[in-house]
Amino acid sequence: MSKLPFLPVFQSTAWIPLLSICFLIGWLSPVDAKETTIIQLTDPVYPKKPKKEHSLTAYFNDEGFPSGYSMELINEVCLDGVCKLVEVTMYWDALGFYQSLEYPEGKPLTKVEHEPFVPADYEKLDSILKDRESILDDHELGFLASEKDDKSPEGEDDDEYQEVDGVSKATPGAVKEAVVKDAAWTTWVLWKYANTELVPIMQRMTKSQFSPDFLMHLLDSKDWRRVAFVINHLLGQKPVAPQYLDEIAALMPLAGIDHIELAIEYLRKASPDKNTCYRKLIGTLPELNGYNAALVIELLESDGQLENEILERLAASIGNQEYYLIHLALRLIEGREFFSNAIEADIVKLLEVQDFFIARRASDFLSNQKLSASAKEKLDAFRVKHADRL
């Protein structure tokens, strides 16, 4: 078989993208233990026919945790049965995210006129198969065969010319960018196997191995796809397990906009009380990006019964934030009509920051409070210094 173990393969002398190699390290290795399970899958080309049996291999690392899956696939890729069969082995990580494929020696993927894929084709295919949001999810194979192609090349018999992928029909324009050129059907079939029916099967198999150590192993990876997988599992438990509160709070600065709300939901549901949740969320504010920090402040603002201690913690956490977030926090504190020595001390510091707009916002806030003598002196000095800008 033309391959390197568990890596994307293009040809026997193929160029392997370094990023693909790095991404797979730690998930699959040639020494992993493995188990094979017989599963049944719908053939995406013929979805009304009985399901077909496939052998799904699960791999386990040296700690006994699931590290990934593979499946050999031999499948038709067109509706008329005359296309060349696709023969590959596909690989996924433990969460069911497609990772790579390889083909048998001498049997590369092909396209028009049996032309083998070149490295650029495999690279594009790899990126397509890793895109779970692909437009291919919205279309069936028949859609790719909805338009007749131009005539066969001069001297080519029509039937013979149709024996390759993507020749007998033209690819509709809506999906041209979502498939490998002249290999639309092959792309579609492989995408369906990579991202649809098989994914929940692998996820159930991985979840069947869940243990506190395995969950912590996934969290320790700091990979938010794995973290989200764990959180979704925890949120499905009743009651929601609280023992991962600190770990997930610590991971929030790494969360993107697709995951931050999931993390907040876990902290809300797993915390023994709302103040525990608020303390942990506020503790993350100095390291959160603007969007994520705004969501935390928005959550606090939605609670009309915030305790004074929480307001003080909020004031103490905003010193290194950008203007808009400081404005949101001060607006929240102003709306609760609460002021204390602790809040005074934290906001007075903002008068000295280099960003004048932040300092001016702090000045406006302090001007409406009953201040200590030292704080009033600093505020007055600021207002005199910047009188022409206030």
Residues of each region from the PLM?
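Bacterial Sec-dependent N-terminal signal peptides
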Residues: 1-42
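Extended repeat-based scaffolds of very large eukaryotic assembly and lipid-transport proteins
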Residues: 34-261, 265, 269-294
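Short, flexible helical or helix-coil boundary motifs
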Residues: 132, 136-139, 143, 307, ...
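Amphipathic alpha-helical scaffolding segments comprising HEAT/armadillo-like alpha-solenoid repeats
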Residues: 207-219, 241-251, 273-284, 305-317, ...
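Short coil turns that connect the paired helices of HEAT/ARM alpha-solenoid repeats
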Residues: 219-225, 252-258, 286-291, 316-324, ...
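Alpha-solenoid helical repeat scaffolds
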Residues: 229, 247, 262-263, 295-298, ...
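Residue-level signature of the C-terminal ends
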Residues: 233-237, 266-273, 288, 299-306, ...
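C-terminal structural cap/anchor segments
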Residues: 290-324
